[in-house]
Amino acid sequence: MTLQEEIIRQLGVKASIDPKEEIRKTVDFLKTYLRKHSFLKTYVLGISGGQDSTLAGKLAQMAIAELREETGDQAYQFIAVRLPYGVQADEADAQKALAFIMPDQTLTINIKAAVDGQVAALQEAGIEISDFNKGNIKARQRMISQYAIAGQMAGAVIGTDHAAENITGFFTKFGDGGADILPLFRLNKRQGKALLKVLGADAALYEKVPTADLEDQKPGLADEVALGVTYQDIDDYLEGKLISKVAQATIEKWWHKGQHKRHLPITIFDDFWK
């Protein structure tokens, strides 16, 4: 088995999908998880205005609405959370995503004070934080807020990790990589876009340039620039297609580099890192 085949197997990616079937499968998955855990009544998800959180949010709201209808239990709620650092440059996109999702509840937690306070405390201790590291603090602070909400609201935190993100390790360890449930796992970027099209999302929500937008000194840095490879190449690779040797080497480099992010903390029994 080639490395490409092994990665595809691990991430469960299909070469082609039926978007309607995947929508139904995902909604049922989200419903089943809450039914299985009767002490949970809500899903919590940060909404940025990008493709991934828009899709995960819409599917979560659909699942919650069906659960309420099927059980008559109005305690089932989907809580969308805006988590800007100060003023978000593409706030209009986030509002457009919320209008599409129509969440039961929307909360806004501005993380700037918490992040800046942490950076200042570290500086007082003699630790200068790089812009890149500060970006990871932002991602982790967003998850602190989401878990605080979930803890108070009998909730589970939804993550937006999908195959094209997982393969490159393009997420913050214990930040956006830390969640309770990953409804988009198995889908690549273009497949997620296909689901949003079927769901009737405004094209602007899935055609915009993907960006983590975590670094102050590189605002709106495109994912593809940061990774050095296009999502088209990543998606093709995940669908078992041939791509250029340069693109393949870049993707596989990121796969190996990000292995530690795909595991629980390393124990003496682990050998994947050797």
UniProtKB/Swiss-Prot annotation:
CDD domains: NAD_synthase
Residues annotated as binding Mg(2+): D52, E165
One MF term in the entry's GO annotations: glutaminase activity
Enzyme class: ligase
Binding-site positions, ATP: G46, I47, S48, G49, G50, Q51, D52, S53, T160, K189, T211
EC number(s) given by UniProt: 6.3.1.5
Reaction(s) catalysed by this chain's protein: deamido-NAD(+) + NH4(+) + ATP = AMP + diphosphate + NAD(+) + H(+)
Superkingdom in the source lineage: Bacteria
GO biological process terms on file: NAD biosynthetic process
Keyword annotations: ATP-binding, Ligase, Magnesium, Metal-binding, NAD, Nucleotide-binding
Binding-site list for deamido-NAD(+): R140, K173, D180, H260, K261
Pathway: Cofactor biosynthesis; NAD(+) biosynthesis; NAD(+) from deamido-NAD(+) (ammonia route): step 1/1
One cellular component term from this protein's GO annotations in UniProt: cytoplasm
InterPro entries: NAD/GMP_synthase, NAD_synthase, NH(3)-dep_NAD(+)_synth, Rossmann-like_a/b/a_fold
PANTHER family on file: NH 3 /GLUTAMINE-DEPENDENT NAD + SYNTHETASE, NH(3)-DEPENDENT NAD(+) SYNTHETASE
Its biological purpose: Catalyzes the ATP-dependent amidation of deamido-NAD to form NAD. Uses ammonia as a nitrogen source.
Family that this chain belongs to: Belongs to the NAD synthetase family.
NCBIfam families found in the cross-reference section: nadE, PRK00768.1
Subunit description: Homodimer.
Identification of the protein by name: NH(3)-dependent NAD(+) synthetase
Gene this chain is encoded by: nadE
